[in-house]
Amino acid sequence: MIQLRPHQARIVDSMSTNPKGQVIVPTGGGKTLCMIKDAQRVFNSGNKWGFLLKEPDRKTIVVVSPRILLAQQHSDSFEEFLGLNPMLQRKVLHVHSGDTSHESTTNADAIKYWHDKNNKFNKLIFTTYHSLHRIKESGINVDTIYFDEAHNSVQRHFYPATEFYSGLDNVRCYFFTATPKYNKSVESPSMDDEEIYGKEIEKISASELIDSGYILPPKMLVKELEMTEVGRTPVWKESEHLLDTIDECGVDKVLICARRIAQIVNLVDDTTFCSKLSSRGYSWMYITSKTGGIINGQSVSRDEFFETLSAWGKEDSKRFVVLHHSILSEGINVPGLEAALFMRNMNHVAISQTIGRVIRTDNDNKQFGIVCVPVYDRVGISTVKKVSAVVETILS
């Protein structure tokens, strides 16, 4: 049985009485569980046999994610919590270009064929913003859509499908995000357009979740180092700066947000960074769209990378450093992380999402999530200003 926290119960109650709306909840607030609980109610509602109906009314639910990795993670979570309940019989389809153990396609005709042949079952479709238009093109009936990390939906290529489904009276649409995206230009999509996005049916503050013990407060740490001109810091010096900063943080599980993919590769290939990590008892790993997953110098599949990352995160005594550029910042659940090191500046959304990776309550010994910026050039100075502003917003 799914047990909801008080703020989650408020969200689910609001979803049951509003056919459209925005749910603003900080990272770590358990929004996926709210989707699952609502889906359970929707699927159960179709089991009520009408007087003249020979079959129950089956439902189709779509879950939209910004990345394939998050779509796969959502799929696993839904399957785990919905389980094998015979009253929740369902078929699962993935509509994206990634690998999955479930049926998968991005062909509109194939989507319609799958939908029609499974008319006796409830249906769950996991897709990305890149591929949502394929479901639209299929012409299938959709009952409910959960737009996760909904700030992505305002992007020019993603907005038409969002606008289409939001404009249908018989489709429930919910937009989940910690960081709603607003645009000042009337010509650009914006989440303050209530005709498309609805009202904010629930807005949960980070301070409420911190006070309730559901997430941890972030702790800002600025590591001041020898200053150099931007672009003039040799990679061996960046390696030393990073190692000094990791030592300063004094924790076991560290996420490094690199400036460029090339910076990660150069640190690994051209310096003693990894060997010095090993001498400190740290394993190391990184993943990029160009190199794939690397664990302690060995190439691994994406599945093995994330399985290892999850396992290490749950192992209290394990020490590791994971480097990335952007692939781990949004939505991806990485348990156990204790500190995030910002090597580069980001927008407000990306900073908030990254901080969200380290303020989850993963173990009893963790009292806060460390948010650290090593400062050795002008990039570091500007990064401190933006990251500090986000931390202050979370704590206010």
Where are these predicted regions, by residue range?
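Conserved Walker A/P-loop ATP-binding site and its immediately adjacent core
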Residues: 32-37, 51-80, 259-265
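Conserved interdomain linker/interface between the two RecA-like ATPase lobes of SF2 helicase motors
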Residues: 198-265, 270-271
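Post-DEXD/H (motif II) to motif III coupling segment of the RecA-like Helicase ATP-binding lobe
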Residues: 151-215
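Conserved RecA-like P-loop NTPase helicase motor core
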Residues: 151-152, 289-396
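Conserved helix-turn-beta segment of the N-terminal RecA-like "Helicase ATP-binding" lobe
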Residues: 53, 69-105, 275
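Walker A/P-loop
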Residues: 18-42
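Inter-Walker segment of RecA-like/P-loop motor cores
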Residues: 85-136
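Conserved pre-motif I regulatory segment
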Residues: 1-24
